[in-house]
Amino acid sequence: RQMCIRDSFYTAEELAEIEVPHPSKTVMKHMGTPSVSEAAALLSANNSRLLVPKKKGENYTVAAALDIRTVRQGHIEIVGAGPGDPDLVSVRGRQMLERADLILDAGSLVPKELTLCAKAGATVLSSASMDLEEQFEVMKKFYDKGKFIVRLHTGDPCIYGAIQEQMNYFDQHGMSYHITPGISSFQAAAAALKSQFTIPEKVQSIILTRGEGRTPMPEREKLHLMARSQSTMCIFLSASIAEQVQEELLQEYPETTPVAVCYHLTWKDEQIFRGELKDLARIVKENNLTLTTMIVVGEAIGNREGLSRLYAHEFKHLYRK
C-alpha cells in the first residue's frame, strides 16, 4: 500500500518557539534551537499532542505528534422527533438518526418507526426508565469514544423539552452538541384543525403555556392573566387539570369561546374533540384524556373571517410594485 507523506521544513527560529519536554543544550549549540524532532513533530501536528517523545538512533532522532484535528471527536445532536408521525421529522433529523452510533429516545413518546433507520450496529436505548444521571452516564461513555449521539425528544426539544439540564451538563464537560428543531404539537394542532391561529386585525398572538400542576407557574404567568389578551392559547401538559384550566380561562374568555382538545396529534389513533370553553372539563373527562393531549382555546379555531392584506391587488411590497 502506498503512503502519501507530506514534507515540511521549518527554520531554527520557528522550532525554537515550540515548548518541548526534552530540550537539549547540545542541539541548541549546534542547531540554534533546543529541539528539532519534537518541535518539528508538534509544529506539523498544529502543536497538539506529543505521541512519541524523541528517540535517538545511530544516525537519526525521531519523534511523533498527534494532530487532534484528525481524531474523531464525540458529538451530541439533540433532535426534535416532531409530534408523532414519523414522516414529520425533518430531513436533517432523519440524517442525524441514520448517522448515529447511539440513539437515546424518549421511549413510548417517540414512535419506534422513527429509529428503524438506524445504521447497522447502532445502539438504540429508551430513556424512559433512566434518571438524568443514568442518561448522562451512557451518553458520556459513547461521547468519550468519539461516537455520534442522537438525543431524540418529542415535538420540538426547545418547547417543554427538558433539555436545559442536559445542555448545562454538556457545557460543564466541554461536550460538542447541536439542536435540530422539530415540529411542535401546537403546529400539528393548527394543521389538524385546519385553522390559522392568527386572524388579521383580531388575533395576532399565539400563547404557548401550561396549567399549574406539579410544576409551579410564575405569578405573572397564571392562566387567567395570560387569558386577558384573548389570544389563541395552546396549553401543553394540562389535560389532567382540565377543570382548573377551564375555571381560570373563564375569568377572561367568554364561555362560548371555541376549544379543541387534541389527543395523540398525528399518531394513528389521533382524536380531536371540539366544543366551547364551558364544556372543556367535561370533554376531557368523558373521553378519559390525560397524557399527550393539547388544549387549544380561541376564536381562531375554525375561523374563516378576516383577510390578509398580503395578496390584495393594491398592496405593494418588495416583489410586487
Predicted regions and their residues:
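Short glycine-rich anion-binding loops that position phosphate/pyrophosphate groups of nucleotides
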Residues: K55-N59, D67-I68, P83-P86, L109, ...
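Short, solvent-exposed amphipathic alpha-helical segments in soluble enzyme
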Residues: L66-R69, V91-M96, A118-G121, Q166-Y169, ...
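Metal-ion/cofactor- or nucleotide/acyl-coenzyme-handling active-site neighborhoods
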Residues: D7, A63-L66, V71-R72, S127, ...
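Acidic/glycine-enriched edge-of-secondary-structure segments
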Residues: G121-D131, K202-R210, M233-C234
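Class I S-adenosyl-L-methionine
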Residues: Q2, R6-L42, R69-P86, V91-I183, ...
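C-terminal edge-of-domain segments
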Residues: E38-R69, T293-E299
